[in-house]
């Protein structure tokens, strides 16, 4: 083998590995989703679900996310049921009935989230207590890119006796 050819092959191999690493990085690191400081505050009674809006995309949201799932993490003083929901075509602050605010209320896994949609968490507990809900983490694909990103805001809830 001629030394020039060996050197050229080495450079090509390094360039190919570098290109593959760049493509892997690009595909697995989509841009961050909007987050907000502070938190949403809600109060509900034992056994009564409350719907808390934790992220609203707004009509100027220029992205379309194909949602694979939503992960919720909460610290609570009592057992609590949490269910992420996609509010299609609307947004919710805090309510016991999201129907007037959402065109559709769906399981976000397998749906597309776009402008004017929002993420809502249904919270219900069978005992009085407190819940601190972290920002939701969305697993999504956007074009060729996919990843997990936090979005929206945190929530603090009080569950009281009726």
Predicted regions and their residues:
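Non-catalytic macromolecular-recognition regions in eukaryotic signaling proteins
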Residues: 2-162
């Amino acid at each position: 083998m001629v030394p020039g050819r060996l050197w050229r092959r080495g450079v090509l191999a390094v360039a190919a590995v570098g290109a593959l690493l760049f493509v892997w990085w690009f595909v697995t690191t989509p841009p961050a989703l909007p987050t907000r400081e502070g938190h949403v505050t809600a109060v509900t009674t034992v056994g009564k679900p409350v719907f808390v809006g934790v992220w609203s995309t707004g009509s100027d949201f220029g992205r379309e996310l194909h949602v694979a799932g939503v992960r919720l993490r909460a610290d609570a003083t009592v057992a609590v049921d949490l269910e992420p929901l996609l509010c299609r075509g609307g947004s919710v602050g805090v309510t016991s009935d999201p129907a007037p605010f959402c065109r559709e209320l769906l399981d976000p896994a397998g749906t597309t989230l776009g402008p004017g949609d929002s993420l809502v968490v249904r919270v219900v507990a069978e005992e009085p207590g407190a819940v601190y809900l972290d920002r939701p983490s969305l697993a999504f694909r956007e074009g060729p890119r996919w990843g997990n990103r936090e979005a929206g805001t945190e929530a603090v809830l009080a569950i009281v006796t009726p």
